[in-house]
Amino acid sequence: MAGFGLPNFGQLTEAFKKAQQIQQNAQKLQEELEVMEIEGTNDDNRAKIWMSGNQKPLRVEIDPSLLSEGKAIIEEAILDAMKSAHEVSTSTMKERMEDLTGGFKLNLPGMGEEN
C-alpha cells in the first residue's frame, strides 16, 4: 500500500502516538492556563486588568488619580489595559500550545497573527 502514497504503518503508528501524547498534555495545559494571572496595563499603569491564560477576565484595578480624568480618558485607559492583557495572554497561550505540539502549527481560531 505504500506504493499508493500512503504512509507506512510505522509512520502512522508514530503519528498516532504523537497525537495521543498531545491530547494527554492538552488537559494539563488547559488547567495551567486557567489558573494563570496575566496583567495588562495602560501606558501610565493607572489602569490594570488581569486575565487568565485562557483570556478570561479576572479583575480590574483603577488608580484613584485616574478617576478625576474624565470618562473618555478612563475608558481609553481601561481599553488599553485590556488590549495589553489580551495580547500577553494570547501570546502566552500560543507559546504554550507550540511547546505542547512541538512547534507543529495548528492554525487555531483566535491564535493567528492578525490584530
UniProtKB/Swiss-Prot annotation:
Any one GO CC term of the record: cytosol
Keyword annotations from UniProtKB, A to Z: Cytoplasm, DNA-binding
InterPro entries on file: YbaB-like_sf, YbaB/EbfC
Keyword Kinase attached: no
Highest rank taxon of the organism: Bacteria
Keyword Coiled coil carried by entry: no
Sequence segments annotated as region (Disordered): 89-115
GO molecular function terms attached to this record: DNA binding
Subcellular location field: Cytoplasm, Nucleoid
Family: Belongs to the YbaB/EbfC family.
Chain's role: Binds to DNA and alters its conformation. May be involved in regulation of gene expression, nucleoid organization and DNA protection.
NCBIfam families linked: DNA_YbaB_EbfC
Subunit and partners: Homodimer.
Name of this protein: Nucleoid-associated protein PMN2A_1347
